[in-house]
């Protein structure tokens, strides 16, 4: 089983539940083949990945329930059923870093200083880097990967901040230039 893929699924569902609230419903997550290969720690073509994901879904069925796998070309959809949504809701921390981060960035007028204070409150060494790539203004992450190992790309939209978070591997694959 791919622990990295399971973690990615759980983290994405948790993020959605923190933003939108919990509902016991099917959640669809979309992944490009390249990201799945990274999470599965091996290179595969789309047909091989479909088979690997079918096996993976059987392995995590006890926790995440049924996961329906579909694809169009090299874009995969993992439809995690209501049982999986409930399991994530019951097994994640509603008061941790991500909850604090999402609550802050969801408020109109949130500042970068407020977000950095949250990062620093939840982790030791925080990497902060100005970006000039036309897409994002800052790259922020926990250098030791705790409490999470995602790269947070933050953009100042004038009246509010927005973000996307990526695995380090996906972020590096984008090839964004930094200062």
Predicted features along the sequence, with ranges:
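Short secondary-structure junctions
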Residues: 20, 62-69, 120-131, 178
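Intrinsically disordered, low-complexity regulatory segments enriched in Ser/Thr/Pro
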Residues: 146-177
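A cross-family detector of function-defining hotspots
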Residues: 111, 117-152
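Short glycine-rich, basic-tinged beta-strand/loop micro-motifs
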Residues: 23-43, 98-104
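Charged low-complexity interaction tracts in eukaryotic proteins
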Residues: 58-94, 134, 138, 160
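Positively charged, polyanion-binding regions of nucleic-acid-associated proteins
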Residues: 1-29
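Charge-enriched amphipathic alpha-helical scaffolds
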Residues: 27, 37-66
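Long, charged/polar, surface-exposed segments that mediate recognition or autoinhibition
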Residues: 95-119
């Amino acid at each position: 089983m791919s622990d990295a893929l399971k973690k990615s699924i759980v983290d994405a569902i948790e993020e959605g539940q923190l933003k939108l609230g919990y509902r016991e419903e099917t959640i669809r997550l979309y992944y490009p083949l390249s990201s799945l290969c990274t999470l599965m720690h091996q290179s595969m073509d789309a047909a091989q990945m479909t088979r690997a994901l079918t096996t993976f879904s059987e392995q995590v069925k006890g926790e995440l329930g049924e996961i329906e796998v579909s694809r169009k070309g090299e874009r995969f959809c993992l439809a995690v059923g209501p049982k999986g949504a409930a399991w994530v809701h019951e097994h994640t921390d509603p008061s941790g870093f991500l909850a604090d981060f999402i609550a802050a960035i969801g408020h109109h007028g949130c500042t970068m200083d407020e977000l950095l204070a949250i990062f620093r409150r939840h982790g030791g060494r925080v990497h902060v880097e100005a970006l000039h790539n036309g897409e994002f203004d800052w790259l922020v992450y926990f250098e030791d990967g705790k409490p999470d190992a995602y790269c947070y790309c933050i953009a100042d939209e004038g009246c509010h901040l927005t973000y996307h978070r990526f695995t380090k591997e996906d972020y590096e694959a984008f090839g964004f230039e930094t200062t």
